[in-house]
Amino acid sequence: MTTAALQTQLQGYLDYLIIERSIAANTLSSYRRDLIRYSKHLSDRGIEDLAKVGEHDVSEFLVALRRGDPDSGVAALSAVSAARALIAVRGLHRFAVAEGLVDLDVARAVRPPTPGRRLPKSLTVDEVLALLESVGGESRADGPLVLRNRALLELLYSTGSRISEAVGLDVDDVDTQARTVLLQGKGGKQRLVPVGRPAVQALDAYLVRGRSDLARRGPGMLATPAIFLNARGGRLSRQSAWQVLQDAAEHAGITSGVSPHMLRHSFATHLLEGGADIRVVQELMGHASVTTTQIYTLVTVQALREVWAGAHPRAK
């Protein structure tokens, strides 16, 4: 059990992130989860205060994250997830130094694990088309949920948006005449991205024939400006949007474990395969660095290599 002192110090840092840093709710949730795990790690080692933490305690926390605890049902974290947890821990210790709670930043020298370079998985163009067509949305007899689902999936693929960006859209963020969408990215950064005609048509159909029906099911005085609504008239959650995608993949016969991020990967990969400049793809994806976008060029190079290996007489 986490001690009262550790709980107070942890909550003080979280309050600082909310009030002073105004970090996004999703980021705050991740920090809280990682820091609760860290405080439990310290408590299990008999440490009741951040002033008693040493560099080796932080290093051992990383080891514990990577190893997991099968006996307690705690899964091992990937190098990427463990590195993310270390960011939260480092922030906590920097805060403790700044607030005079401790004298030294014992987490500063701890290095994150090096993640392996994994190529992002993407769908083929035919698989994406099958996915989109599996939800309907083209008949006037389609209900509001079908219209919503088609519009959501079309928008995800057309814009390459993150699932949180899509469900966070308000009606005023979409201009179907100009065929643009204003996305709220990580760190509150906005970007205006173009939307393809099929996605605009799906959005128009949903906004005209579907959304108003769903909105009437919600409390009138608390009507949400969200574009994508759930069956009760409230904003669609990330989890529900994920389920929409999984159901569509199942109906399309795609068994490769489709996720919202896979649709985003497909967006980037298909653009690069079509000859798009990597800097343009970076802007569309909302990546802070082009290095993040370059991983998708490896996917297209890998596809070219496979074709070459099967066709060139001197490949083998």
UniProtKB/Swiss-Prot annotation:
Keywords: Cell cycle, Cell division, Chromosome partition, Cytoplasm, DNA integration, DNA recombination, DNA-binding. One of its GO terms (cellular component) is cytoplasm. This is Tyrosine recombinase XerD. The active site is at 162, 186, 261, 264, 287, 296 (o-(3'-phospho-dna)-tyrosine intermediate). The keyword Zinc-finger does not apply. The gene is xerD. Coiled coil: none annotated. Residues 4-97 form the Core-binding (CB) domain. Its main location: cytoplasm. Belongs to the 'phage' integrase family. XerD subfamily. Site-specific tyrosine recombinase, which acts by catalyzing the cutting and rejoining of the recombining DNA molecules. The XerC-XerD complex is essential to convert dimers of the bacterial chromosome into monomers to permit their segregation at cell division. It also contributes to the segregational stability of plasmids. Transmembrane segments: none annotated. The keyword Cell division applies. One of its GO terms (molecular function) is tyrosine-based site-specific recombinase activity. It holds the Pfam family Phage_integrase. It comes from Mycobacterium leprae (strain TN). PROSITE patterns: CB, TYR_RECOMBINASE. It is found in: Cytoplasm. Forms a cyclic heterotetrameric complex composed of two molecules of XerC and two molecules of XerD.
